[in-house]
Regions:
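Catalytic-core "active-site belt" of small-molecule-metabolizing enzymes
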Residues: 1-166
Length: 167
């Protein structure tokens, strides 16, 4: 299991959000089945059944060991790398399910719905200083990991209260 950290960095029109207030208030944590992840440049196949599909950019944290109820001060021991990930969402299906007050996780949690880039190894000092620049035509958006609203350590500690994290 990987923990996907962060809110969408761009909307369906590929324009940057004006502010990252949503991220600053609380970082979103998504847990995904192993089959949702594609890595190493493997192709992503979008299912026909979902309708319109949007891509959402996220930050992925690679978990390096098994843990449960991890105190924040020890969280650094449980992850070793970061990557950018593209999460594909079936937005048409998600909207219909939300209107019907039905669970909409299947619109985001299907086989191959998350494509992770190459994980970059971290040192203890690097985590707060990482800056990610997204280039889309002429626009650039900068995301600083320290501006996610919660630190990665805090997110790992929170997630491990509710479920075991593992490699």
């Amino acid at each position: 299991m990987k923990i996907i950290v962060g809110e969408p960095l761009a909307n369906s029109n590929n324009t940057a959000y004006q502010t990252l207030d949503i991220i600053r208030k609380s970082a979103r944590i998504s847990t995904l089945a192993d089959t949702t992840l594609t890595t190493h440049g493997k192709p992503v196949f979008v299912p026909d059944w979902g309708g319109k599909c949007n891509a959402v950019l996220c930050v992925a944290v690679r978990i390096s060991r098994l843990g449960k109820s991890i105190p924040q001060r020890f969280a650094k021991r449980y992850y070793d790398a970061l990557s950018l990930a593209v999460k594909f969402e079936m937005s048409g299906m998600k909207t219909e399910l939300q209107k019907a007050c039905e669970p909409w996780y299947m619109a985001e949690n299907f086989d191959g719905s998350v494509s992770c880039g190459t994980f970059e190894e971290l040192s203890d000092k690097e985590v707060g200083n990482i800056k990610i620049l997204l280039k889309n035509g002429e626009k650039e958006t900068a995301l600083e990991i320290e501006n996610l609203g919660k630190s990665i350590d805090e997110i790992i500690a929170t997630a491990s209260e509710f479920l075991s994290i593992r490699q």
